[in-house]
């Protein structure tokens, strides 16, 4: 990302792994959507904070990129050691701040920590209009619809994100002013640990203990 000045940076922070045949983070859909978007906007860069080789049963991302003829210079990955051993909070925040938008259109989330981390840094989100995500994005973010997909392992429905809808959301994000979103920052503050503790946990514990 050091060479990303003047570029439109699309970020994704997700584990590249699968449960059986289910790749919940939707890497293939997201990468195809980016390939379509990049043809119109060659100034776009995709940063994937993940293991590119999918050593936990995920995709071989370089193969995915090659199948879609995405130029190597249009995609960035973290340093392998940094990814394996973790980054300092300040370094991770610097990555989030460098994004113009976070792509988080997974099949479903129970919470989706990167979604909230990105917004705390002022970065808006493109998320799935499914499961917990609609409750976890600010009003100036974007939600993507898709096709319901049955997951027998969890006995529940997920959603496969619609690729043209992801492309459209990227176009909307590209058309917006660049820079931090104060709306996203203010929204994320409601999920700060001290706020959640005082606003929700203390009253709940008080009721349970009376």
PLM feature spans:
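Conserved donor-binding/catalytic core segment of Leloir-type glycosyltransferases
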Residues: 2-25, 31-34, 38, 47-48
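Nucleotide-activated donor-binding/catalytic signature segment of Leloir-type glycosyltransferases, i.e.
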Residues: 58-94
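A short alpha->beta transition loop at the rim of the catalytic pocket in nucleotide-sugar-dependent
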Residues: 100, 120-122, 129
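Aromatic "clamp/platform" in nucleotide-sugar-dependent glycosyltransferases that forms part
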Residues: 107
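Short hydrophobic beta-strand element within catalytic cores of glycosyltransferases
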Residues: 115, 124-127, 137, 142-143
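A charged, aromatic-enriched C-terminal amphipathic alpha-helix characteristic of glycosyltransferases
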Residues: 161, 165, 175-205
